[in-house]
């Protein structure tokens, strides 16, 4: 399973946090992937909107994963 799903659909960049069992806590690897996508989209004039969402019902994001 991928911890963060990054995709582009037209002018929308989408980042989905995908660690519902860990309340979508961010790992260092996830942060690096998100940063890479944001830098890429900043340089892409086609991307006008960045949408961040999360899988799971309990939490959007509980913050940084302290066990990582």
Show where each model-derived region lies.
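Conserved CoA-thioester-binding segment of acyl-CoA-metabolizing enzymes
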Residues: 1-60
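Short, flexible, mixed-charge acidic loops at enzyme active sites
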Residues: 63-68
């Amino acid at each position: 399973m991928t911890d963060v799903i990054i995709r582009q659909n037209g002018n929308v960049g989408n980042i989905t946090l995908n660690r519902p069992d860990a309340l979508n806590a961010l790992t260092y690897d996830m942060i690096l992937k998100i940063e890479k996508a944001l830098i890429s989209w900043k340089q892409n004039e086609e991307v006008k909107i960045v949408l961040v969402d999360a899988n799971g019902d309990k939490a959007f994001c509980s913050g940084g994963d302290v066990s990582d």
